[in-house]
């Protein structure tokens, strides 16, 4: 553990941020998994709603610096591709 006051504060702050980031990352992954579950069931309406939620979570993660914008773009593109495949069928 740190001895210097500023280092102690940084350690506390870092731990808070780590917990917050883990929470946001978990919520993002959960939203994606929910979407993929609806795609498996071929439930178009619920899949469309879940896609919107997952897209928002990905965009929010980019804004907060959790993931890179290209990573979010790639994930959204793949999710959209899955959504379009069940809409077409």
Swiss-Prot record:
GO MF: small ribosomal subunit rRNA binding; structural constituent of ribosome
Entry's transmembrane regions: none
Chain residue ranges for the region called Disordered: 1-25
Example GO BP: translation
Entry GO terms, CC: cytosol; small ribosomal subunit
Keywords of this entry: Ribonucleoprotein, Ribosomal protein, RNA-binding, rRNA-binding
Residue spans of biased composition, Basic residues class: 7-20
Record family assignment: Belongs to the bacterial ribosomal protein bS20 family.
Function statement: Binds directly to 16S ribosomal RNA.
Protein name, as recorded: Small ribosomal subunit protein bS20
Organism: Geobacillus sp. (strain WCH70)
